Amino acid sequence: MFGGIIVLRKLFLLLLILSFFATASTCRRRNTDAVTVSLSEKFTAFDTLTSAASDVAAERVKSLMFNALVKKDANFDYVGELAKEIKTSEDGKTITFVLQDNVKFHNGKAFTSADVKYTFDELFKSNGFKSGAFFDTVPDDSSPAATPPKTIDNSNGAKTPAEPKTKRVAHISSIETPDAKTVIFTVTRPALRNQLLANLVAIPIIPTDSAAQQKDTPVGSGPFKFVAFDASQNIVELEANTEYWDGAPKIPKLRVKTVTDAQSLQNELQAGGVDIAPLPTNLPPDVLKAMNGSGNLKVDQFDGSNIQYLVFNAQSPPLNNPKIRQAIGYAIDRQKIVSQLLFDQAKPASSILPPQSWAYSPGTQYTFDQARSKQLLQEAGYKGEPITFKYGAGNAATNQYAQVIQSALNDVGLNVRIETLEVNTIRQQLAQGQFQIYTGQWVGGNQDPIFLRDLFSSTKIPGGSVSCCNRSRYQNAEVDKLVEEAVNSVDRAKAKELYGKTWDIVSSELPLLPLWYPGNM
């Protein structure tokens, strides 16, 4: 899902583009039938179904070419996309999808239930990044626990709590296709229905026998069709799917290219080389403000639900002490950053979940208080140990606010240094726990409270068969219990209460600090 700022040219085509990008963009119309879209990160693969790791840029391109069985509506509820009807059995374990009529893939093949079954067979055969969402990770008592290795950012090595050995248990017991228009998923327990729907959103349905070609020549059922890819320039050419089942796009051609440098993107927008720049983009907020009203450029804003955050390695000294993490929470003036650096293109975050979520709970609030921060550092016995703050290189906006955060932390007596790394290196180090503080943005995933389990359950600490998402390596037995009860509850009111208790504990111990909700513009 897209999130972020939209800078646009004043014309109705913006609305057409937004219908496919689901959020923000920059648009300028030239004398051509092609619209050029810029992304700030390179897309490394088109096959997002079976890929081993997440690729945000590739997911954005994928959203133009593919459909899923399920999508989110404006209220973050799950509704059908390629499914026109979703029915649940009385026992809650059988979910039946009645498929849309008259859907065709880009190769002309009619869409049937066999394609859904084939897609999931390929997904589970690949054991890729997305397949893990359809499994529970549970303790494996047959294997001894493993202690993390000693690293630069985890210098206490053997003193760190042992990582429990785990195994995967499938959510889905069967997928049946009784006829061409019906797919029946059976889950192992009733509470997994909502997890199934949440996970189906990210699964692009592909035609039978097409898996081998998806990497180089993707074929889906979405509004745009793949034409060509220039790997040297990181440019993909798309054309309108004139037989698109949900209404043909009015834009004949779409070009998606990577522009990683902020100045280059600004120049291209002003010169007309780029029409749309969906966020996260690499344009700093001050540039966006200056571009608003410049020529035909305009910035429109509405509330966003994505979350910018700091994640702390809760197993790396001195951040293994909750008081150090709490001190950081009080040291950062988020309202000032939002007002003066982001020019109110965001709202300070009070939770990892957006306020629009049915499970939202504010938890412990960290209002700016330098005196409280210094007191906590004193109570923690902090002696000036160095702390490394890492983030991906190449994004001018991130660089601006990261330096402000570094300065704020050093002002209260912390010894923080910045290290910028290539994005893939950062991802690898996060998975291995080789960091202390990292800043990033979750796009879309935080709209469902199941996200709390992904971020804070000890069963989600990366390692072994687990690739996501408890990057803080946070462990709390009570949180594990509460969040599992919440995820498995079929009573929304009870689940809301349990998720609230979970966030109360987590926000107090603070393995992750919500910063702000970036605006969609």
Indicate where each model-derived feature is located.
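Extracytoplasmic/peripheral linker and loop segments enriched in polar/acidic and small residues
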Residues: 28, 411, 415-426, 431, ...
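N-terminal lobe/hinge region of extracytoplasmic solute-binding protein
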Residues: 39-90, 121, 217-221
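A structural "hinge/loop" feature
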Residues: 41-60, 82-84, 109, 131-134, ...
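Aromatic- and charge-enriched surface segment that lines or borders ligand/interaction sites
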Residues: 84-132, 184, 268, 318
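Surface-exposed binding/hinge segments that line
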Residues: 98, 133-207
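Aromatic-rich, solvent-exposed beta-strand/loop patch
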Residues: 106, 186-203, 218-264, 285-307
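Ligand/substrate-recognition segments at binding pockets and active sites
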Residues: 231, 378-445, 492
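Append "and occasionally in soluble cytosolic enzymes with long acidic Gly/Pro-rich linkers
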Residues: 239, 319-407, 411-412, 473-482, ...
